[in-house]
Design a protein with these regions (language model features):
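N-terminal beta1-alpha1-beta2 module of alpha/beta enzyme domains
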Residues: 1-72, 167-170
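Flexible, glycine-rich active-site loops centered on histidine and acidic residues
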Residues: 2-20, 80-148, 191-193, 198-202, ...
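Conserved, mostly hydrophobic/aromatic
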Residues: 3, 36, 44, 63, ...
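Hydrophobic faces of well-ordered beta-strands that scaffold small-molecule active sites
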Residues: 3-7, 40-42, 72-74, 102-106, ...
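An alpha-helical appendage that flanks or caps ligand/catalytic pockets
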Residues: 5, 124-161, 202-313
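Active-site mouth loops of central-metabolism enzymes
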Residues: 7-22, 77-84, 166-176, 232-235, ...
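Acidic (Asp/Glu)-rich catalytic clusters
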Residues: 33-34, 60-68, 91, 95-102, ...
């Protein structure tokens, strides 16, 4: 099982400058590159300081000039926010500039806050339908001379300009959860990205079950790869692990508040949650975070990751967005590289 870093600029306070957050994100990616991680993933979000990521291709092009070896992945572009011709062209240009280091992760999106601003009236179902129309379209645009008459997009015969360096195209990954999304990915020759979010390892097993069932159903298609994304913290003591569980619990409370889309947003920042609100959450608790997420000293983390490797996961992505200080993120990532990854070499 190989390892990657999943990272964004995350701004939780107006005291943090966006330039500093960008520089810190780049430094974490450079640590991952020097440390032998396989890839860096960064995604797309709009008008949210919680996850500042208006166009992942911009970040990846910059990273290509500041790293040497890591694959550079979109984790993920949000299909309904793109036109197929624009996505095919920007992805192909990124592949050329990065000298063939691009992986493309694509998702339907998750936040109604973004949907109502980017595609008013769209719900999660129709976002998923756009994803299913998008992937065959961009593949055909890269082949060239492709005419499209779909439900959401129509255009006459077109060839992506440019076409990607990697042939027939960069690896495509689909963010999947339910059985249908796994089946769509496998049937279309795409790799799969999954995350249990805050849930425990029974969810990790369930997601692998969906993937295996899809591979069995479409056994005529070469088996794609599957990546597991989890919030991870490699601690230097149990006290440090407990602090991380508290911090990740706070992160998930804010994640949930953005997801519900009911709280006031001012200057791109959501209204702060009080300690009482965080403590009253029905299922986000520090105890659940400590148990479910990959939080612990090196040996505990190794044991968890060995179990995921045995399940059949090809890649484990270290989700570092946690609301922690840069110093704590950096220390955890360095312990991951120095104390955990060598066991899997």
């Amino acid at each position: 099982m190989r390892f990657s870093l999943f990272v964004h600029m995350e701004r939780v306070s107006d005291q943090q400058t966006q330039k500093q957050l960008y520089d810190e994100m780049i430094e974490l990616c450079q640590i991952a590159d020097r440390g032998g991680m396989h890839a860096v993933w960064t995604g797309e979000h709009h008008a949210m300081n919680f996850t500042i990521a208006p166009n992942p291709f911009l970040n990846l092009v910059d990273l290509a000039n500041k790293t040497k070896n890591v694959r550079l992945g979109t984790g993920t572009v949000v299909a309904p926010f793109w036109h197929p011709i624009k996505l095919a062209g920007e992805a192909a240009m990124t592949d050329i500039i990065t000298n063939g280091r691009l992986d493309i992760g694509i998702a339907r999106g998750a936040y109604s806050f973004e949907y109502e601003r980017m595609v008013p009236g769209m719900d999660a179902w129709s976002a998923g339908q756009r994803l299913r129309e998008m992937i065959p379209a961009i593949k055909n645009l890269w082949k060239g001379d492709y005419e499209h008459n779909g439900e959401f997009w129509q255009f006459p015969k077109t060839t992506s300009a440019p076409q990607p360096l990697q042939q027939p195209h960069p690896p495509i990954w689909v963010a999947a959860r339910d059985p249908n999304s796994h089946e769509f990915a496998v049937q279309n020759g795409c790799n799969v990205q999954v995350t249990p979010l805050h849930l425990g390892d029974e969810e990790v097993e369930k997601l692998m079950g969906h993937f295996n069932a899809a591979c069995e159903k479409f056994s005529d298609v070469p088996r794609p790869e599957i990546m597991l994304l989890r919030h991870t913290y490699v601690a230097d003591s149990e006290e440090d692990a407990q602090l991380a569980a508290d911090e990740i619990n706070t992160f998930y409370n804010y994640f949930g508040a953005w997801f519900k889309n009911e709280r006031e947003i001012k200057q791109g920042l959501i209204a702060p949650l009080s300690p009482e609100e965080i403590a009253a959450h029905p299922f986000y608790t520090p105890e659940a975070m400590r148990k479910n997420n990959v939080i612990g000293q090196a040996q505990e983390v190794i044991d968890r990751l060995k179990a995921y490797e045995a399940m059949g996961y090809n890649e484990y992505s270290f989700w570092i967005d946690t609301g922690m200080s840069f110093e704590r993120k950096k220390a955890s990532l360095e312990r991951m590289i120095n104390e955990v990854m060598p066991v899997f070499a």
